[in-house]
C-alpha cells in the first residue's frame, strides 16, 4: 500500500536526515539538541522553550520520567522551530491551536513516519503497539495513538483510491 507523506512528515524526515538520524535507536533528545545547537537544561519546573540572543533553549521538567521529558522536548521543539512570536500577545484560540499543533507534531517527531514505514509491524495490534513502544522508547498509549494516526492515513489513501478508481495516484 502506498503512503504519501504530509508536509510535516517530510519536514521531520529531512530534519532527521540533516542531523544523521536514520534509525529509531539513534533518536535521543540530547543528541538532537546538540546537533541543532539547542541548550538543554533540567529544572523542577514546567517544561518550556525560549529563544534568547539568537540561542534556542529548552528547559525540561526534572521531575518527569525520561519518556515524559522526550514528549515535552518534542512539543517545545515544535514551538521553537515551527512557531514564531510571543504567545502572550496572541489570542487564546491561536495559542490553543499552536499547542494542539505541537501535540500532533510530538507524535510524528517521536515516531517518524520515515522510520515507522520501514518496520514490519505485527498484524496483532497489541503486539504492534508493544513493538513500536519498545523500539521508539515511548509509552504503549503513545504508540497506540501514533499507530492510529498512521493506519488512519493509510486507510484514507486506500479509500480514496477505491472511490476514484485511481490505483496509481498522480503524485507518486
Curated annotation (Swiss-Prot):
This is Uncharacterized protein YqaB. It comes from the Bacteria. The lineage of its organism: Bacteria, Bacillati, Bacillota, Bacilli, Bacillales. It holds the Pfam family Peptidase_M78.
Amino acid at each position: 500500500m502506498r503512503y504519501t507523506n504530509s508536509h510535516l512528515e517530510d519536514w521531520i524526515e529531512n530534519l532527521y536526515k540533516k542531523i544523521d538520524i536514520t534509525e529509531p535507536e539513534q533518536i535521543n533528545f540530547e543528541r538532537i539538541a546538540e546537533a541543532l545547537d539547542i541548550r538543554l537544561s533540567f529544572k523542577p519546573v514546567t517544561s518550556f522553550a525560549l529563544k534568547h540572543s539568537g540561542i534556542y533553549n529548552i528547559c525540561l521538567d526534572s521531575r518527569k520520567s525520561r519518556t515524559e521529558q522526550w514528549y515535552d522536548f518534542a512539543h517545545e521543539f515544535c514551538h521553537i522551530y515551527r512557531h514564531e512570536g510571543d504567545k502572550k500577545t496572541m489570542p487564546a484560540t491561536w495559542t490553543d491551536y499552536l499547542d494542539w499543533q505541537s501535540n500532533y507534531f510530538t507524535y510524528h517527531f517521536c515516531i517518524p513516519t520515515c522510520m515507522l514505514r520501514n518496520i514490519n509491524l505485527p498484524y496483532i495490534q497489541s503486539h504492534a503497539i508493544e513493538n513500536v513502544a519498545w523500539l521508539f522508547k515511548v509509552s504503549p498509549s503513545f504508540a497506540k495513538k501514533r499507530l492510529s494516526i498512521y493506519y488512519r492515513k493509510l486507510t484514507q489513501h486506500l479509500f480514496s483510491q477505491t472511490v476514484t478508481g485511481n490505483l496509481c495516484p498522480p503524485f507518486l
